[in-house]
Each structure stands twice: as C-alpha cells, then as structure tokens.
Amino acid sequence: MDAESLHRLALPVSAVAFLLFALVLPTARLSRRTGRAAFVLHRRANPFQRVIGVCMGLFILGLTAWSALYAALGPESLGVWPVPDALRWLGWAMMAAGLVLVLVAQVQMGASWRVGIDREPTALVTDGLFSVVRNPIFAGMLWVVVGMACVTPSAWTWMACADYVLLVSLQVRLEEEHLARLHGPAYREYAARVGRFLPGVGRLAAAEVTA
C-alpha cells in the first residue's frame, strides 16, 4: 500500500475513532456515572448558545463527510493541494496529540465535563491540564482540525480551521460569563492566572470577567 492509499484509508477511520473516543464513549460514561446528559448546547436559554450548538454539529458532520469523500474520491477530486509527505505526517502527529489532549482533559474534568453550558452547577476544575490552559479540550480539538488540514490541505480545510476558531471563541466567551457567575472570585482569580488556549496567553483582568 502506497502512502496516498494509506492516507485515504486512515482519515475516515481516524474521524470515526475521534467521534467514538472523544464524544460517544465519554457521553455514555458520564450518563452512567451521574445520570446527567453531556450534550447541553441546546438547553441554554440564550438563543445564541443554540445557534453555536447547531453550527458545531454541522462542523463535525462536515469534517466527517470530508473524510469519507477523501477516501472515496481521492485528493484531486476535492481540490487537495500537493504537499510534501513530511507535512502530512506532521498532520497525523498533530491529530494524535490533539486526541490525547482531549481525552486526558475529559478524564481530569470528571463529572464536570459537558458539551455546552449546563444550568446545573458543576465543580471548577483548575488542576492537571487546566492549570496550564483554561480550555485544553478546545485546544486539543484545534490540534486535530489543523492536523486534518495538514493531511488534506485545501481551501475547504483551512476555511474549516478558521470556522472552528470563530465558533470556539464565541462559545468560550459564553462559558466564561457563566463560570464567573457560578464560581465568582474563584473563577476570576483562575482566569487572571491561566491562559485561555495557550500558556500565559489570554489571561483575563478581573474587569474582563463579568459576574
């Protein structure tokens, strides 16, 4: 099997693995342990949260469909740019590292993990990966998305990266407001000390986090 055939076979397998290990299994585990739902993007009273939830769902479906089309049709049909194999293998490494980051962060969140903003109170997690950045799950997912763009570089995949950054930036700001209301000074001190997606970058002054 040549390298191109391997890439075409591995991409949809990787997409399914990500959905299984990063979404389906953690959701089932949380429901079994706590009786609560993990997906709460649609429950928020703020209609903007629901719009973000729909866009996130479409984004995931789009990447999954892209993976399947890449396997079925090949790079030329999708307008994938020819790039050195080294960049594509770097992309695979980024996808693997991003998935590991997501899984570790989910385990460290424990019963506090949600997809979206839950009306029910959850504990503030500030240790482990969360002592390095406030949003390691979103950061790990960005590694996965950028890695996929390196494996199948095209106008579509790099636009997907930009879309992901926009959606996550909007979602994180809603979550920051919610956490400030829920945890008060404890969250404001944490947000002033720890970066948003990168260590030391995106720390908030107390005035920026409204309660």
Ranges and model annotations:
Residues 1-119, 123-126, 144-211:
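Membrane-anchoring alpha-helices and their flanking helix-loop junctions
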Residues 125-133:
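A short amphipathic helical element positioned immediately N-terminal to and/or at the very start
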Residues 133-140, 197:
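Loop-to-transmembrane-helix entry motif
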